[in-house]
Amino acid sequence: MLTLRSVMFPRLKPVIIALALIGFAVPATRGTAKEYSIVIEQKRIVERGSRIVIRNEYGDVRVAGSDRDTVEAIATNTNGSQAVPVTISEGSSGNQRVFTVSPVEGGRSARQQINLEIKVPRDVELEAIGIRRGNIRVMDLNGGVRLRTDEGHITVSRVGSPAGGLVEVMAPNGNVDLSHINGDVRIVAISSNITVQCVKGDVAARVASGHIEVSNIDGDVELNVSSGSAFFTGAIHSAGRYRLQTLSGEVSMNIPDTVGFTAALSSYSGQIHSDFQSPNATLANSTNRRIKHGDGSGRIELDSFNGSVSLRKIVASSGADCQR
């Protein structure tokens, strides 16, 4: 039977059902669009010789050099399951362009850890500052780097160029591992174990509590430890200067006998050992010993106030492979 309702509103029920379905579908679509609209990667063209500054209070930072002319940054939460907004801002300092990479302000809750993974051109300078807790890893750069984390480990490898590149590290509480550095190294730490190997320039490292171990260094070496040990292994150079000191702990230097040197060994409370017993060796007293080997050109100073001091002989082929 035809009624007024059926004549004026044919197919009314299917239309209502369709509208209801659309009503449920639209919010879901909008929600999905909002979720994937988060900036998960930033990219910016960078001039050669620019400086990249990284800020990330809580979380790890990983930086790798590439042959591209862009800086690219991705930020994720600790387990890597959720993208976090990241920004790259541009400024200048004198004639140098400065690009600052950081998670977007307000993109994290208090003390939430956010990890940054950044790719930069090889020929840039790098500076990581404002990192309170997190590890830093940097590799494959030709420019210098300046790194600091208040609590975390720092690892740097394959950094520098024939023109040189200073690697400067401050690590109040965390280990430091540097290798294949084509330039000078400066390290200041409070509680840290420091390992440095295969460096083309000078090495100067200081730690309050921990140990320092360096090997295969082409430049001068100065290691200073308040409480802990200091070790050097590798060839020395005729014009080289090597100074290892600790207040409380062991000092040891292991070198081939292929280069002449003059060594001053001292320990106020500890034993002195040497494999180099040349006719020119002198024993001033029980706490000091001077040794001249060969032409005496290199200069070695090993000192421990409370600990043993050793100067050991190794074969020339000993040591790590320092090819990059």
What are these regions (language model features)?
Residues M1-R324:
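Intrinsically disordered, low-complexity terminal regions
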